Amino acid sequence: HISQSLNFDLAILEKYKDRCKNLKYIIIPIDYFSMYSTLENGIENWRVKNYSIYYDISTYGNYWSGFEIFNGKLPSNISRVKSYLLNRKSDVTCNKFGFGTNYNSKDSKDLMETGKTASKRHTIKLENNQTTFSKNIQTINSIIEFANSHNLKIIFITCPAYSTYRENLNPIQLENSVNIIKKLSSKNTNTAYYNFLTDKSFIAEDYYDAD
């Protein structure tokens, strides 16, 4: 899901562990911002309600996460309700296989502008987020333990991004994130890590936005 953080990756695995008899691989994205953020503490924390409402996953006493109407911007929610009631326009933006349908490179945004804005949005004040970094390491270790106990393999990936995004990243934040996942992967035989951030096989036409 968009903006899904590591703690919800783990929560979904634990919730559906008995329904995944044929599962062999778990793919976990570890991107520039992943180790220093959680969904609850980010600018898109309104998405937490999706896990409470549609997955019945605990959101740690957040009463308001049980309501669509009280999350996000009220005018947007009213517009969504009107669109459905008047035009039967669904707000579901994925296909039956779970793949998102909202973003298509044919309708791409300005790669120069989105590279700058996204990199700024994803850059964290490191000194204020060491606790989150440590908690996310614990979460990854829990995911690895889950995979071990269910005889699963984990593939960690860093997704490709356009040059205008990469050029504006904090090198320390990026290095910390890449190094920790390399370290955790090297210590566990059921894991692999692939870094596609600078992969040159992806060209401008492949991107919807720079990140």
Question: Model-derived features: where do they sit?
Answer:
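Loop/turn elements at helix/coil->beta-strand transitions in domains of secreted/extracellular proteins
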Residues: 21-25, 148-155, 188-192
